[in-house]
């Protein structure tokens, strides 16, 4: 299984994840943040993610959780891949519904991995991958607002909001500024041991 997911820079400052490097074995869970409406669908089950981490899916809703999250959280399954969506509209669906939408695939920001012990009978959302490629995306200046004591910017951009000149391939995230930038992480399950890889989230 191959995926590309967004790693937002604030994870480093908050101590959620360590800087990653190419070749590293990681154990991760994932979130999809929808960019459109979630709808019931009769489409065949699928999950496709592009190299900018933008994805489309038609996936089966497994459980729905209303605690400990502030918004309803639904676990979705498409073939061998499971992920969560945290969205108010999850309350409109029932377990077993097939739901389709588009969105961005991201590293779990902590709501699943950190509070795993609080979910009733949680399904396994963790996957062991090898990091195959790391791309740093520096936010174009029009998305960055600089003040005397602070810098404001979004945590990530869609693929159509930046250009090839904003992307830099890295062997390691060590030593980066983790400022107005985010990272596209290419992951692959092939050739990586599925045993003895601890969860990459530092608080787990």
Give residue ranges: language-model regions.
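Long, compositionally biased, intrinsically disordered segments
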Residues: 1-3, 7, 18-27, 36-65, ...
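Long terminal accessory segments
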Residues: 172-204
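Short, structured beta-strand/loop micro-motifs enriched in basic residues and often containing a Trp
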Residues: 1-12, 78-84
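Short nucleic-acid-contacting surface segments enriched for D/E, G, S/T with interspersed K/R
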Residues: 13-28, 88-103
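Short aromatic-glycine-enriched beta-strand elements
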Residues: 68-76, 180-185
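Short, Lys/Arg- and Gly-enriched loop/turn segments at beta-strand edges
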Residues: 32-45, 107-117
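Eukaryotic intrinsically disordered, low-complexity regulatory regions
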Residues: 65, 74-100, 176
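Structural detector for short beta-strands of small beta-barrel domains
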Residues: 44-71, 97-105, 120-175
């Amino acid at each position: 299984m191959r995926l590309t997911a967004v790693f937002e820079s604030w994870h480093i400052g908050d101590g959620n994840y360590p800087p990653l490097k190419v070749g590293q074995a990681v154990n991760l869970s994932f979130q999809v943040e929808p960019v459109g409406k979630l709808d019931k669908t009769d489409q065949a089950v699928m999950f496709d993610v592009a190299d900018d981490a933008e994805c489309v899916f038609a996936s089966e809703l497994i459980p729905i959780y209303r605690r400990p999250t502030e918004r309803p959280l639904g676990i979705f399954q498409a073939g061998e891949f499971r992920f969560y969506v945290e969205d108010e509209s999850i309350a409109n669906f029932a377990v077993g519904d097939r739901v389709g939408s588009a969105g961005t695939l991201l590293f779990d920001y902590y709501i699943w991995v950190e509070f795993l012990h609080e979910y009733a009978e949680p399904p396994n959302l963790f996957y062991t991958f090898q990091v195959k490629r790391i791309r740093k995306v520096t936010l174009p200046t029009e998305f960055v607002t600089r003040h005397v004591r602070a810098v404001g910017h979004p945590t990530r951009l869609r693929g159509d909001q930046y250009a090839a000149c904003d992307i830099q391939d890295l062997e390691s995230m060590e030593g980066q500024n983790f400022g107005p930038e985010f990272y596209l992480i290419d992951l692959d399950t092939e050739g990586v041991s599925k045993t003895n890889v601890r969860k990459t989230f530092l608080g787990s």
